[in-house]
Amino acid sequence: MPLLTLTSDIGNPDYLVGAVKAQLLQTNPEFQIIDISHSIPPFNYPQAAYVCRSAIKNFPDFTYHLILVNLFEKKPEQLLLAFHNNQYFICADNGLLTMILEENPEIIIGIPLDKAAIKNTIYLTSVMGKIVNQLVNGESIKNIGSSDVQYLEKRHLRPMLDNNSIEGQIIFIDSFENVIVNITREQFEEQRKGRGFRIVFKRDEMIDHISESYADVREGEKLALFNSAGYLEIAINKGNAAGLFGLKGFSEKMRQGQLSYQTVRVYFE
């Protein structure tokens, strides 16, 4: 059965999540649909990219990833169909695709939308479902739309690196109020070069040890670890790190204000 994932900013309480799945199953009852998340905050591209990127790498080859995030940032004229690292992606032309992939896709196709159609979520879902069905039935990706496509590119939020420090941004706060920073284990170790370190946040909070699990510290104590996706996480064992320390996730509005509670710095010494 064709395996599809769904990621959206619709919100779980909304009927539209069920309607989207129903629309896909009308196209092909054999579709196996897996939810990644429907709780992406509107317009939060860094969080959407993190959630999609972290989940997608765990799926088998030739999974179809349908991303219904910020579908209507501008009036939609086309959808994007991409193939990269043996995965298919279908999403709006809003820049999110290149943020998820952290590079340009191996193959990208523009799928023009019917100018006369009412461009709502159900219509766009129906187009996505038909695209998947064409691929499942053996049609070449290059025959489905136009390979001569212009599309919006946005770059993912990168940490600032120098010889003695890394400055990262909070990109996600999970349901336990653990704080995820856009610093990967690989970036951390490459910059560290075996040196000691201090992870500094909220001006005067500091951690100088990487834990393997929450249980490495006493209940109520803060810790840092690398999560299952390989990103730096700041947490409190059986506590609420984001709330206690007043930390907040990244947003474009915050970046313009350069607010300190979204920044985490690592100093090597």
Predicted features along the sequence, with ranges:
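N-terminal glycine-/serine-/threonine-rich phosphate-binding loop
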Residues: M1-P76
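Structural motif
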Residues: P2-T5, F31-I34, T63-L66, L79-L81, ...
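Fold-independent oxyanion-binding glycine-rich loops
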Residues: S8-I10, I36, L68-L71, H84-N85, ...
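Active-site histidine-anchored catalytic micro-motif
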Residues: T27, Q32, Y45-Q47, P60-F62, ...
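A short, compositionally biased
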Residues: K75-E77, E190-G196, Q258-Q262
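Anionic-ligand-binding alpha/beta catalytic cores of soluble enzymes and soluble regulatory domains
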Residues: A117-I183, Q187-K193
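A conserved acidic, glycine/proline-rich C-terminal tail/linker
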Residues: N182-R255
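Conserved glycine-rich phosphate/nucleotide-binding loop
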Residues: E252-E269
